[in-house]
Each structure stands twice: as structure tokens, then as C-alpha cells.
Amino acid sequence: PSLALERLSMLKGNGAMCVVTAVYGNRAYEDTLLQMQDYAQTAGFQVIAAISAVAEHSIIRKYTAGRPNLNDYKGLAEFGDRILEKAASGALSTPVVPGNRPYKKAGAGMIPQADATCTACGLCAQKCPSGAISADQLKLPDKSKCISCMRCVSICPVHARKISQLMTSVAADESVMVDGKIDMSKVN
């Protein structure tokens, strides 16, 4: 998301080696690795490796049923060993990563809302990584800050934060998805 790229642009790599990583819900990560590689290099990092790692999809669980699994963990451990070997050897070539220039335009993200069962405990505001939920406005997240990570949904003790059933159904229909987000122009 743009927030991650904004924060990455504040870093100063000073030639330090780095590995760019895209964690995704076993669906698609589009231009993420390329964008991160570009931003990391601009910030002065030497990108020596890149990986896309599967994780549980934060909205549509069917995409990652049973993932990550033991094979995924084994693959990550082997990748880590190869990175260490590469760094130790001094053969620090820049990886070729998938993606498009110009980057594909991202669609609108899905913003979780609190329903009437919200107890106003404030945990969502405390734990939101992007500051999209204000302690003063718990039920109205700032759409410009929300990165659709679903942290608020996963930690709500009363399960009051949700994506609407309509949006969840639409997201499950891959024909309306563009770059991992819903393209409303494709919704009937």
C-alpha cells in the first residue's frame, strides 16, 4: 500500500543490503515487489533478494485454506539460507522481479466498519498500524489512512468490526478484482 511506500521512502539505506518481501493471501501481489525494489534502491539500499510469501488472506479465507503450511515454512527457511550464502559470497546481483512500469493503478480498498455490537473498548484504535481509527471516532475509520489489513477485524473482542457481506461476496468474485482490490466499475 501507499502508506508502506511512504514510510519506506523515509529510510536511508546507505548501501545496506536488503531483501524485499511481499506477503500475500495466495491470490496476487501484482507490482508490489517491483515497487518495493524501486523504493528501496531509491532510498539507498542494495536489494540482493526478493520473495513473495503466502499468508492467510485477511478477507477471503478460501484463497489460503491450509496456508502457510510446512512446505511454505521449509521454502522460507531454504530461501533464508540462500540469502545468507549470497551475502557471504559477495555476489550481490540485483534480483529480477515481476511487475509493471508504470505500476498498475490500485482500486479502492475494503474498509471494515464497526456495527451496533461495538463496545467502544478502543482496542482497534490502539492497534491500527496506520492510525486510521481514532479513539474519538471508533466507528468511522479514516478511509484515506486505512490499508485494509483487517487487524481491527482480527482483534475485536466482540467481533463488531466487519466488511459488509456484499463487499465480501464481491471480493470473492475474482472477475471484479483488479490488483487485489474491487473495481466497482465491474460490479453488477
Model-identified regions with their sequence ranges:
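FMN-binding flavodoxin-like domain, especially the glycine-rich phosphate-binding loop
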Residues: P1-G107, L166-V187
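A mid-sequence, solvent-exposed acidic-amphipathic segment
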Residues: T94-P129
